[in-house]
Amino acid sequence: MLMRTDPFREFDRITRELTAPGTWSRPTAMPMDACREGDTYVVSFDLPGVDPEAIEIDIERNMLTVKAERGPAGNAEHVRMEVAERPLGVFSRQLVLADTLDTEQVRADYDAGVLTLRIPIAERAKRRRVKVGQGESHRQITG
């Protein structure tokens, strides 16, 4: 049996999936940056227009999950949108954290639409010098 594929229909389907608002079962990814500042990793997520109360941050084992939801502005009953280009819905991002990070000391700040997480490196993973001692017996190696 010969199947025909309409590339325009397929393109429309992909466009709808990419531009559709996120849902809790299928959230949209949020942009992020990550860098290291000394002994701390800094991860920033763009979440403009999101109420800080609508942001959830969970760490389970080594999986960090950030979820946020942005709804329509104002009271939806009395608002008639003329232009709606800003994405609405649920946004989510998951990161696998290394065992060398201290997940008990994660700090989160939300300012000017940017969520910033600071994740310190665990003390046990920081660089340290090991002093070399001299043994009790001194033997000369001959060969």
From Swiss-Prot:
Lineage: superkingdom: Bacteria
Cystine residue pairs: none
Transmembrane segments: none
Keywords (A to Z) from UniProt: Stress response
Induction (record text): By heat shock.
Pfam family, one: HSP20
sHSP domain span: 23-135
Similarity comment: Belongs to the small heat shock protein (HSP20) family.
Protein name, UniProt field: 18 kDa heat shock protein
Species in which this protein is naturally found: Streptomyces albus G
Source taxonomy: Bacteria, Bacillati, Actinomycetota, Actinomycetes, Kitasatosporales
